[in-house]
Amino acid sequence: SGKTLSYLMPTLDAIYRASCGEPVSSTSAYSGAENLNNRANVLYISPAKALSADQLTALTSYNLPGLHAASYDGDTPTGERRWIREHANFILTTPDMLNYSILSNHRQWASFLRGLRYVVLDEAHSYRGVFGAHIANLLRRLRRVCALYRTVPVFYGASATSSNPVESFSKLIGVPQQAVTAITESTSARGETTVALWEPEFMPPKAHDQLAKGARSTQQQAVQSKAEQEAPRRVSPVEQGAQMLTDLVLSRTRSLVFAGSRRSVEILSQKTQRYLDEVEAGLSHRVAAYRAGYTPEERRELERKLRNGELLGLASTSALELGIDISGLDAVLVAGWPGTRASFMQRVGRAGRSGQDALAVLIADDNPLDTYLVHHPEAIFGQEVEATVFDPTNPYVLSPQLCAAAQEAPIRAEELSLFGPHTAALLDRLVQQGYLRRRPDGWYWTHAESAADLVDIRGTGGGPYQLIDAEDGTLVGTMDAAHAMSQGHPGAIYIHQNAQYVVESLSEGERVILLSRVYPDYYTRAVESTEVRILVERARVSYSAPAGAAIPGEPAPGESAPETDAQQLAPLTMHRGQVQVTDQVTGYRRFSVYGGEYLGEEEQPMPPEVLMTEAVWFTFEPSYLFGAGVTEEDGPGTLHAAEHAAIGLLPLIATSDRWDLGGLSTLLHVDTGRPTIFVYDAAPGGAGISERGFNAVAQWLSATLEAIESCGCENGCPSCVHSPKCGNRNEPLSKHGARALLQAMLQSMAEA
């Protein structure tokens, strides 16, 4: 799109002029202040280390006099860091290092900060949800620290997929919208990209899988639910992606495949290599996997091989989604909808960057949202990319950020507006909790520990776990804390560059997961249980039963209903508020790597994890369900199926994917006393997703109903009401009941 050139021209020009002794002026648009010396330093911030490394390669290739560019991230050797602080004038870093190293140790960076003229935020659209809220506060902290050194840098936000650049960027850096100028003309030289939407075929009958891998034991069959056994299943996007990538590599088409998880990436790469070995020996080594958790050396080597053409096919997570400049890619496969139109366009844009025509294929996963999208291409191409949703005032985000800001410099009363309207109340609470100390001139951090350690920017729940080979003690890789319980539990299969391991043990205290090398023919998926408790109700909307509904027990005309509900809730009520979610991994399932066949389930209880977050929930009078045609027997399955489908379709109207959400349904909830469906944000403090559903409920539920009605299955399948995350093995489920209930809910809302 030409966005890189738009910030490189002014920043490199300033660096060159400063190196020649010429006067440099970079007046800030939002304050009128300017730097007081003639240095020209640039701080480039990207959400991924791979993107920073790519930009550094491009910068050094310019051989510009006076340019001293360097990466400063977790992979930077300790011996090089002091030189970078004292001599580099174009530093490429990540939000993590800005928090843990630069701002918290800003006195060591005084020389660089005094000459800081430009801050570049690459891929600015990626700062959404809780991550975006952290980045917004991090940038406010950066502006505070810059003010200590009497510098007011110009901020550049670069994004090729932003629907509201002025609004989102002004909110991100904390300035008025009138201070932001949008440059929206694309100047890139691109060929034509053909985009195909591919819905895989249904798999052969279950007997085919059993013949292929041998019959399972009766006990194993019994563990899998009846619904899952009988439901038709499509070929998985991983299997379909491996088949397509094999064909592309055989035709020497340089290709990139995006998959949704680390395990999927490894399996896809493994399958492709096996298929290639069956057809043309010697090609399998030109296919690899790329994801977080590899060592820095492994990542850099893979990036090098992809650029120079040694690799013909690469399976990647979102780690390669961002604007890494890889010329010569001819095809991109997207194995499963990535969650947002912005993310999809980013992935499609990886191909054809050298001006040649390109191919992009979305391979639909077997779930309601993917099914909806392949049959409604206008939902992808007929509208702008999603708004970037984040809330800088989220108290779970802002509280640790305020502690870090107070350590960098005491927070003065006149600065409170910088962090939002709830800052004073949060500061008082932090004083009461002993984190801060209030003095006449402001709020102080008085502890010996670094306050920056309280800030969990990526919501990973603490530092990463080291994956250690139990046989020789070598470091295999790392795993973030957010995935440790579900992917690092004993018995889990872990794949690293086609080498397979089984987890022997997990130590929370030592942050170590011990692995043993194995050669299994299955992969694992965790089984989880969930409990939701209501803490605070922030809003509610009440609806009556649909006109003409047959409500058992409803009073006759002229009679009044007895007041039996303590809360006086309506027949249908939609709520929004704060909830506490307790998740626990209780075991895991095994699936065949060949056809995805279910092989059995093992118990493996892990410590529970507690999440305080935001949710939307629906409560029903029992008579409302009867009036909608839902029998008492179908009640649990109706609520369960409606919950699954609603979670699957909410990402259609909010910047998220279904893995950013969780849910629970019950015929009698302990806090509401009635049938209840919960949909909650799977992030501490919330991410604004459920609130978007609350505010656009008719659009949300209409899409959910359409997805169910348009699915050709009889009793429910992954394309409509099954969920890959379900801890109850997708049982009970009533597709017909969910359809009837959603029809009644939409009628109630239309009549309100």
Residue ranges of model-derived segments:
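Helicase motor core with emphasis on the C-terminal RecA-like subdomain
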Residues: 1-25, 35-95, 99, 103-410, ...
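Flexible loop/turn segments at secondary-structure boundaries
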Residues: 3, 128, 163-166, 265-266, ...
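ASCE P-loop NTPase motor cores of helicases and related translocases
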Residues: 12, 243-244, 705, 723-724, ...
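Intrinsically disordered, low-complexity segments enriched in proline/serine/threonine
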Residues: 12, 25-27, 49, 206, ...
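Acidic, low-complexity intrinsically disordered tails
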Residues: 33, 213-221, 227, 546-562, ...
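Extended Lys/Arg-rich polyanion-binding regions
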Residues: 358-360, 366-384, 391, 401-413, ...
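Short cysteine clusters
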Residues: 711-720
